Curated annotation (Swiss-Prot):
GO molecular function: nickel cation binding; unfolded protein binding
Pfam families per the UniProt record, alphabetical: UreE_C, UreE_N
Function: Involved in urease metallocenter assembly. Binds nickel. Probably functions as a nickel donor during metallocenter assembly.
Cellular location(s): Cytoplasm
Family (UniProt): Belongs to the UreE family.
Protein name per Swiss-Prot or TrEMBL: Urease accessory protein UreE
Species per Swiss-Prot/TrEMBL record: Thermosynechococcus vestitus (strain NIES-2133 / IAM M-273 / BP-1)
GO cellular component, one term: cytoplasm
Amino acid sequence: MFTLTQLCPTPLENARQLHLSLTAEERCRRRLHCHSDEGESLYLKLPRGITLQPGDRLRDEDATVIVTVHAKPEPTLKVMASTPLDLLRAAYHLGNRHVPLEIHTDYLRLGADSVVQTMLEQRGLTVTFEVAPFCPERGAYHAH
């Protein structure tokens, strides 16, 4: 088992390269037992305040392994509107509910939630279930 303790901003040539696909929720956890995409046993033991993003690299204390983080496809809702203003209103209402949200110019993506889906559909928005990578905004006060 490799214990990953820190971010690695630059690639290390002699380290073993692995990949780790995590859901949006898993990327927010500091402590996590998991397996790399290659099947290696991993333990995340990260400092406080780190939210992993796709493309981040993690390393163990000895720099024997470098693990690149990827967004794992997960159940999501894709929200589309007939006008930009309707999409903006949807983002406003979702923000009031503190719903983690991935924002694009022509659609919003959020974790699958039947109650929120019903609310959005009642507002006249088009909501589609998709299994897709989910990368919500990190928030205004995030320091990473």
